[in-house]
Amino acid sequence: MNKQDYIDGAESALLHTYNRFPLVIDHGDGVYLYDTDGKEYLDFAAGIAVQAFGYNNKEYNDALKAQIDKVMHTSNLYYNVPIMNAAKRVLKASQMNRVFFTNSGTEAIEGAIKAAKKYAYTRDGHAGHEIIAMNHSFHGRSIGALSVTGNKHYQEPFEPLLPGVKFADFNDLDSVKALINDKTCAIIFETVQGEGGIYHATEAFIKGVRALCDEHDILLILDEIQCGMGRTGEMFAWQHYGVKPDIMTSAKALGCGVPVGAFLMTERVAEKSLAPGDHGTTYGGNPFVGAAVDKVLEMMERDHITEHVKKVAPYLEKKLDELVAKYDFLTERRGMGLMQGVVCEKPVGQIAAKALEAGLIVITAGSNVLRFVPPLIIEEKDVDEMISRLESIL
């Protein structure tokens, strides 16, 4: 079969929910992917910020193979050792107290919403509470996650969504204050907006929201699904600001390719929120994903991944700034660490598609931002190679 045969086969069998690039990936190694024709691609997308250690990492692979040979799934009717080890590591890294493992980031958001609502229900003795989310945010595509996603394009066909969700403007504290009332139980936002165009929270905003939450007994939920797990130079992006959420979500690089997410909370929230029967999952937190999360966090801590990101990220920023200065149609770079975006005057889909011809994988964030979320193991030479390949098609 040739590449087109694979594409035609997929198009005839899979539900058409993605506008895929005409690329059939066969395997990967390090920071490179290879298609079924053997062509090499430098990957600066990392499976949308998932493959923190790149591809075909032997230590990670061996850990998963060993767990497959023991047991992959047992259900949550019983305890298992790998998920206990994973829980201890993620709680240490996040400074949180309790964790629930899910199968995806979207599921983590659903759990966080339920935990916030149950907390308020336990406190007040009644339901009907509200959540404040942000315009231009993205939290997932299930009904609950979609309800707090601030983009009408995604929401409109599926309305009515969850009631009681109001939208403020990201980094506008006054717009948040204006929406708070005695029904507000939570404020949710991404510490660094991804799909919304790579905007990070200002220090004044995130500290201001934390203060409002403390004043009104509102829970602060921070979505760290894309920006967490070392990507910004701290294990979680909120750790740059000296504030702490009441609930946070994680996924993507948490499993480095294995489908896993998590929502974490403080002991104060855990004591008043989800109890037996309130939430559950069949697959979530099974021994296989536990082994993956445990190994990922072990490697990140041992190999000082956040320190490496702090070292290489300024070089990526410098080279992207030079690119913006060189081309009139590129107007701005923004981001934190190895989560960067370059703004273009026109839609960037054509640039991402054209980059594939040069053996480079980059993706978009919204319609006019080119997104760079490479594996966290990249070196300066990889940045140079990326710039060279990108400039060849600009």
Enumerate the language-model features and the residues they cover:
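Conserved N-terminal phosphate-binding loop of PLP-dependent enzymes in the Aspartate aminotransferase
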Residues: 1-394
